[in-house]
């Protein structure tokens, strides 16, 4: 009960912060492996019955982000997979660099998937309403995915969701800094010496 209340307050504070005109993200270059590991570590404590797996690139992937907010996005997506996936027993998190210079984060579950009728409006809080209480008596405020969308957009990224044969997958992409040709040239010259 206390953890649910804390997460609800965190979501409300984040959406208020992101919605204000003077929002400044605390962006810094962060290794995606550490952000994913932190989110999974916290999720394992709350959801010991779920099997988690993580896949990251072999090379270090540094992404400009507000790590606290991105960890909240990951936590919300994990919790969403468990609550709405209903039959979810495993969640796979993955990060990779895309060809168009984005860092793509994926949260994939083996639950029941997303109703096709909900997919077009999944991130729109004005369309979604609080759901009836779940089996444990808690209400879903409908904030989690709206917060995810707002945080990712504030980072200049995009968030999508789709079903796959064994459940649902949420993918969000954050822009990477442009590669500095001088740095890569210097490194290649040092390697040849």
Where are these regions (language model features)?
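Short conserved segment of the HATPase_c
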Residues: 114-126
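Short helix-loop "hinge" at the ATP-lid/N-box region of the Bergerat-fold HATPase_c
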Residues: 81-82
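Short alpha-helical Gxxx[C/S/T] motif in the catalytic ATP-binding
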Residues: 144, 148
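Short alpha-helical segment of the dimerization/phosphotransfer core of two-component systems
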Residues: 1-5
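Conserved catalytic submotifs in the C-terminal HATPase_c
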Residues: 26-29, 51-61
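Conserved micro-motifs of the catalytic ATP-binding
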Residues: 20-25, 62-65
